[in-house]
């Protein structure tokens, strides 16, 4: 049938006939040095990223306007944190509460997990609470330190994976310094759009 012939034609389209639009990344960080490192990494991966430096306590008040401004497909919220195992009050984490409230704020605007992939947390952050608050990827399951580039590595993989393809969680986490001990996540798809025909 003609419909079947058309389908076969589309299926056989050569990848060079397409052009690709990776998902845009919005990256909030409390550390200027980390921002510079991550910016270099994003450039090396050819992904579009907007990076902003704020103190962790300022993330929540700025995330909404930045999402509205840049309409990202991937949001990174990171900086510094610490886990106090023997804390005498309920504050077991230095900055996790700021990451959690920022994730919640972002989800008010983009509640659909496919519309915005959120990578949140820093060294020793409250993994379970971050996932429960709406993060797609978070640190740190084993309360260990993570490498400064780890969130950027995951963000780039998500940005460069086709929107119809599922992210290989195990493979992705294994590309970070400490694997699933440092960062965990939920099943999700990529954010890259393939456009046909390619315009010369």
Language model segments and positions:
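Short beta->alpha junction loops
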Residues: 51-58
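Proline-aspartate-enriched helix->loop->beta-strand connector
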Residues: 67-80, 135
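C-terminal functional extensions of proteins
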Residues: 145-200
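Catalytic cores of nucleophile-dependent amide-cleaving enzymes
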Residues: 98-146
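A short, glycine/acidic-enriched catalytic loop
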Residues: 83-102
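Short helix-loop-beta junction
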Residues: 39-50
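Extreme N-terminal leader/targeting regions
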Residues: 1-18
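Conserved acidic segment of CheY-like receiver
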Residues: 23-32
